[in-house]
Regions:
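Positively charged, low-complexity terminal tracts
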Residues: 1-114
Length: 114
């Protein structure tokens, strides 16, 4: 399980949501796991903004992201017009996770346009 801190633009409080679809052992992640992490982080933001709403399709476009170093590992941050989501820390090399996310996002842009 992975906790994601979510803040919806226009609100004054953040919430923590839990992702169960991704193994917490980041050292064993594949690009499919990274894709699922990003997808679930975006869906966590959507669910916080629209609780009880229908789950939208996620195409991994229209957001900014960064991987940052923190004691104990790295964090993944996503920002878009709707708000922000942050997950981690993950026990993984910052450069490796950055490269994996870049490949996953680039592949999504190639498939769906950007």
């Amino acid at each position: 399980m992975i906790d994601v801190d979510v803040w919806v633009r226009g609100t004054s409080q953040a919430a923590t949501r839990t992702i169960q679809a991704v193994n917490g052992d980041a050292a064993s992640w594949t690009e499919a796991d990274v894709r699922m992490l990003l997808t679930e982080m975006l869906l966590s933001l959507e669910r916080e903004k629209n609780p009880g709403g229908e789950t939208p399709e996620v195409s991994l476009r229209g957001f900014s992201w960064i991987v940052s170093q923190q004691d104990g590992g790295v964090l993944v941050h996503i920002e878009m017009q709707m708000g922000t989501a942050s997950a981690g820390p993950f026990a993984m090399d910052e450069a490796r996770l950055t490269e994996m996310i870049a490949r996953v996002v680039d592949r999504a842009i190639q498939l769906f346009g950007g």
